[in-house]
Regions:
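Gly/Ser/Thr-rich loops at beta-strand to alpha-helix junctions
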Residues: 90-93
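Short His-Asn-centered micro-motif
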Residues: 87-88, 196
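HTH-adjacent hinge/linker in prokaryotic transcriptional regulators
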Residues: 3-11, 15-17, 21-85, 97-102, ...
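Conserved phosphate- and dinucleotide-binding cores of soluble alpha/beta proteins
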Residues: 7-12, 18-19, 23, 33-34, ...
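Short, small-residue-rich packing micro-motifs
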Residues: 102-104, 108, 112
């Protein structure tokens, strides 16, 4: 079935095979087959591409409840009829999941798993920014910012980060993500970074920007006193 349509919803696959959704999730995690689970869909990975398992497998099943907690806090900031930008990563789909299905909004994204999550929201107008596809983190890197992104000013930008550090700022693993992240920092009216506790104190290779550039940080537990003191001095609100 996947050879015909490239993707299939998890529920549809479970019904087709006569097994539970949990069984399929478990089998995909322990299988080297050229398929992966993104936003509730089983997706064929691109042929001829050596895909990193960081986004697609390892991180997707790591600290899930912590990510969901932080994501729900971030989702509470959204209001009807706003334009919302969603970063790539494995935390941002949980933000979308936490949004009320009755909420009307416009969702901007540039990653496949985030797009698949947004299309499940019945009152969401989805804008997927196209470009060169990078299978390692499932993003579309824009070839021309003037085509779409420069025409958009989100009310809120929700960012994910692999590292959160008062001195070195918010960081991630992939340099290819930076152009869109930097656009969102420049054009969005409010900047919200969503990161579970394991990201604090970490520094990754690609710098998104200083933490002072973000208005709000949503996480799953109270940071240490030194970080809270820094956040108060920097006028960054922290939710946990």
């Amino acid at each position: 079935a996947l050879k015909r349509q490239d993707k299939m919803h998890l529920k549809e696959a479970a019904a087709l095979l006569g097994v539970s959704e949990m069984t399929i999730r478990r089998d995909l995690q322990g299988n080297d087959a050229p398929v992966t689970l993104l936003g509730g869909y089983i997706v064929l990975e691109p042929r001829g591409v050596a895909v990193s398992r960081y986004l697609l497998s390892d991180e997707q099943t790591r600290l899930v409840e912590e990510k969901r907690h932080a994501a729900a806090l971030a989702a509470s900031l959204a209001r009807p009829h706003q334009t919302l930008f969603f970063d790539c990563g494995t935390t941002t789909p949980w933000i979308i999941d936490a949004l009320d299905d009755a909420l009307p909004f416009t969702g901007i994204c540039y990653s496949l798993n985030t797009f698949l999550a947004l299309q499940e929201k019945p009152h969401c107008r989805v804008i997927l920014c196209g470009g060169e596809f990078h299978a390692s983190n499932a993003i579309f890197k824009p070839l021309n910012f003037q085509e779409t992104l420069r025409n958009l000013c989100p009310d809120i930008a929700f960012f994910s980060a692999a590292g959160v550090h008062p001195r070195y700022g918010a960081t991630c693993f992939n340099l290819d993500e930076l152009p869109v992240k930097h656009w969102a920092l420049e054009m969005a009216q409010r900047h919200v970074i969503v990161a579970d506790h394991s990201k604090f104190g970490q520094v990754r290779p690609a710098c998104m920007g200083p933490l002072e550039a973000f208005d709000t940080l949503a996480t799953d537990r109270m940071p240490d006193e030194a970080f809270i003191a820094w956040a108060q001095a920097a006028n960054v609100s922290v939710m946990w």
